[in-house]
């Protein structure tokens, strides 16, 4: 099963600087990471391109907001599982394991979220 980690962003360079490195550190290299950018006017996109060239960037032509921003961006992602994260989420070691385990064990699972 292919999992894509997807982050929505709008002018979030300060948060990206704080939370992207732990995300990459605690990601196995099988999962692609995407940032859907809602037409940021800060240096978010340049920061990602310069410091994290493996992260895929999807640029929305305008700020669609949270839900529509995700909806527009995920149309361009090919994965079995979409893990939607805010840009201020700090992940920990093995955080992906229970997500993948649930989808592998229960074929009827459509969505999960933490407590």
Please place each PLM-identified region on the residue numbering.
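Glycine-rich, basic loop-to-helix element that forms the pyrophosphate-binding segment
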Residues: 59-77
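A conserved acidic beta->alpha catalytic loop
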Residues: 22, 37-45, 62
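Cell-envelope/extracellular polymer assembly enzymes that use nucleotide-activated donors
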Residues: 2-4, 32
């Amino acid at each position: 099963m292919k999992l894509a980690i997807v982050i929505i962003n709008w002018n979030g360079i300060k948060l990206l600087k704080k939370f992207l490195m732990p995300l990459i550190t605690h990601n196995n290299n099988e999962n692609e990471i995407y940032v859907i950018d809602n037409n940021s006017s800060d240096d978010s996109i340049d920061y990602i391109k310069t410091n994290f060239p493996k992260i895929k960037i999807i640029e929305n032509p305008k700020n669609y907001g949270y839900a529509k921003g995700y909806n527009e961006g995920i149309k361009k992602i090919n994965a079995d599982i979409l893990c939607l994260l805010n840009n201020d989420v700090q992940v920990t070691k093995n955080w992906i394991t229970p997500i993948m385990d649930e989808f592998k064990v229960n074929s009827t699972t459509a969505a999960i979220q933490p407590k």
